[in-house]
A protein has these predicted regions:
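Flexible loop and strand-edge segments within Gram-negative outer membrane beta-barrel domains
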Residues: 140-148
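Flexible, low-hydrophobicity surface segments
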Residues: 1-138, 162
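Conserved beta-alpha junction segments in alpha/beta enzyme cores
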Residues: 147-184
């Protein structure tokens, strides 16, 4: 069985409203019409939840504070940093009601400039996505092996310089991301 198979018959369903902008500030959210949809139990927005930051990956690298994932995410955010960022959530008695209510939520955004190139995003004056992190760099890590000072003295050494990147890698789950909880 998968996690979604374990939900009780009386379980409520939550659906998230994703921002349609690459970079924006949420100025206001009107949920009145969404709350009137039959079956809707609650609607929460980025203005309703506390600003408790957590790491994107959701786990620390180690117990060493200098080697942990950066707490840069919020459950719901008023500073949209990518297309699809989470700004509101609907809780309803079934999936259909939740989806209908999502369409009724009115969000006013202030669109902000954005860039699509990593190197451009790190340049001086680039749109800032992460408050408090200069040039949009949240963290830096490197791997060093050998002794560079000695190796550079070696005759015939070939020096290679350039910008190298790797594609995003994501392990693929057999099921969709989901969770369920209950109160005793």
């Amino acid at each position: 069985k998968y996690t979604a198979d374990l939900c009780g018959k009386n379980a409520l369903v939550a659906k998230v409203l994703h921002a349609p902008h690459a970079h924006a500030l949420v100025k206001s959210i009107n949920t009145e019409a969404a709350l009137k949809v039959e079956g809707v139990e609650a609607v929460f927005t980025c203005f309703d939840v506390p600003k408790n930051y957590f790491p994107t990956a959701g786990h620390p690298w180690s117990t060493d504070i200098d080697h942990q994932d950066i707490a840069d995410r919020l459950l719901l955010t008023d500073h949209v940093r990518f297309w699809g960022d989470d700004v509101a959530v609907v809780v309803a008695t079934d999936e259909l009601a939740a989806k209908k209510a999502l369409r009724e939520i009115e969000v006013e955004y202030e669109e902000l400039p954005f860039v699509l190139d990593v190197q451009e995003a790190m340049r001086e004056g680039a749109p800032q996505l992460h408050e408090g992190f200069e040039h949009n760099v949240l963290g830096h890590s490197s791997i060093r092996t050998g002794n560079y000072a000695e190796a550079i003295k070696e005759p015939g050494l070939i020096k290679v310089e350039g910008w190298y990147d790797t594609p995003t890698v994501q392990h693929c789950h057999i099921e969709n991301h989901n969770c369920w909880a209950y109160m005793e």
